[in-house]
């Protein structure tokens, strides 16, 4: 199984890249995670937000693979404990399909993407900045793996 995080946003600050890399480098090859950056749609004072979301959606749809399990990080998704995430990851691994985790832009995901998802996952009821979401997601994926592997990181 290969995990890919398709995330709207490019050119993250160095502290984000370092934080994400710190967790992802600890994962074994059979639980590897790839970050795929999607260029954000143009936003500004007179920007058409719907058009920006559609552009981001087009880019994400182009990156999705046919047999991938698609999971959206969405405000209306289910709240998972670390144990639930680990159980889901174990199921994904046993299923054998690759997994794409979708992280939308500041205005959310294109509805066309949401019609393709198999699960919706909410990281928090809080509003989180996108750079922090990447680090939090990387850490939780690492923590889920440690739980499955019996590693002492998760206590």
Swiss-Prot record:
Residues noted as binding S-adenosyl-L-methionine in the record, renumbered to the chain: 73, 104, 123-128
* EC number(s) reported in the record: 2.1.1.177
What this protein is called in its record is Ribosomal RNA large subunit methyltransferase H
| Catalyzed reactions per annotation | pseudouridine(1915) in 23S rRNA + S-adenosyl-L-methionine = N(3)-methylpseudouridine(1915) in 23S rRNA + S-adenosyl-L-homocysteine + H(+)
Family (UniProt): Belongs to the RNA methyltransferase RlmH family.
The entry's localization annotation reads: Cytoplasm
Q: Supply the source organism for this entry.
A: Chromohalobacter salexigens (strain ATCC BAA-138 / DSM 3043 / CIP 106854 / NCIMB 13768 / 1H11)
Q: Which HAMAP family match?
A: 23SrRNA_methyltr_H (MF_00658)
Q: Which domain of life is it from?
A: Bacteria
Which of the seven top EC classes does this enzyme belong to? Answer: transferase
**Carries keyword S-adenosyl-L-methionine?**
yes
What this chain does, per the entry, is described as: Specifically methylates the pseudouridine at position 1915 (m3Psi1915) in 23S rRNA.
| Keywords from the named record | Cytoplasm, Methyltransferase, rRNA processing, S-adenosyl-L-methionine, Transferase
Please describe the quaternary structure of this protein: Homodimer.
